Amino acid sequence: MELVNEIVEARNFREAWMSVRRNKGAAGIDKMSVDVLDVYMPLHMDDIKQSICRKQYKPSPVRRVFIPKPNGKQRPLGIPTVVDRVVQQATAQVLNRIYEPLFSEHSYGFRPNRSCHQAINQALDYLNAGYEWVVDFDIEKYFDTVNHDKLISILREQVNDSATLHLIRSFLKSGVMEGGFVSATTEGVPQGGCISPILSNIYLDKLDKELESRELRFVRYADDFDIFVKSERSADRVMASVSRWLESKLRLKVSATKTKVVRPTKSVFLGFTFWKSTRGWECRPTDAAKEKLETKVKQILVRKRAAAQPMSYIFTKLNQVIRGWVNYYHIGSMATYLRDVFGPWVRHKVRVVIVKQWKKCSTIHKNLLKIKSIIKSKITDDAIYQASMTRLGWYRQCGLSTINYLLNPQVLALPRANRTDKSKSRPGLVDPYALYQSLRSPICM
């Protein structure tokens, strides 16, 4: 059975269709939404399959969009049409079945049942085994510079089917529409398509095999990879030889300024850096990762905008950001940061928004008395009155011990009434430190 027949096989194609529908996503240049697939695909599926088998399928150019990168620059994405996404997904599913058993155990990106956490734990294993010099590699614009001919040549080693190779090349050459104009794509695998992850892994699997043949300790997540060695001299030698190999064999350019030999404490990998405790090497979020979290919180709590929004909405938005960040970074050491720095900081900013929404001193006084009654506090009514009637600005007022005590973490975490559905309550503010502790508990580890 030729491989192209596996791609267009009914079950595989329907699985691809359902996958695209589940993942939603933006429309391509034809502006067709995912919702239209249920009507479009039954009418056109047979024609699409026949055109693929006859090497006549012509993908549309991808729609260029840009998303911000942590360093302030922008990452270009190519959004295929929803029909092209179905065909790409069907192709990717077949390629995954072929290549997944062949991929290196040191590759963690874009693979089933593999994660960033596993990659970080592998790096820690190397460090704790004594490989304490790190070669941080940076491939310049990897996804934009993959050589098409080289990729097809690599694919041909496992894919002996001209129709499948023709289909993949047609996606690589489909072009990019930006500002109403279509430009040709002579190199690169546009990020944003369903097939891009598997193709990028197939290309860099050659690197994995080369590093394994040299018996090097390495971890790769997509185009982000580190090599771990025992001495600085070995690290310098490895950096030079692997850089030459990448440029000569895979035609990829290694960044001379960003690729460097460092100690683990200066290494940055997948948002983590490393430090040595009495227990050995551990990981923790980088300062840049913390700054990104705090920036997102500030954007939600911009005072003028936040003061006009329901607190239940603000808490929902904050909880999404905090849960997402803590869930990702919880394998790292950050108890002190969450308990003593971030937690108190975010709660103070929330108190400012709450008090500002109350506006009048009389309203502040009334609500603080109500909270006192609920939590059965022994704080005096006079202290509450003084805190309510102060002439301090919002920010300094919310730093007063009385308001801090009454609007404490437990109070902020209380469920809030849902005005549209009285039978349901909306969650209060999640405690980042408590969430971290729950994820770090032995049951969760």
Indicate where each model-derived feature is located:
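Electropositive, glycine- and tryptophan-enriched low-complexity nucleic-acid-binding patches
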Residues: 88-106
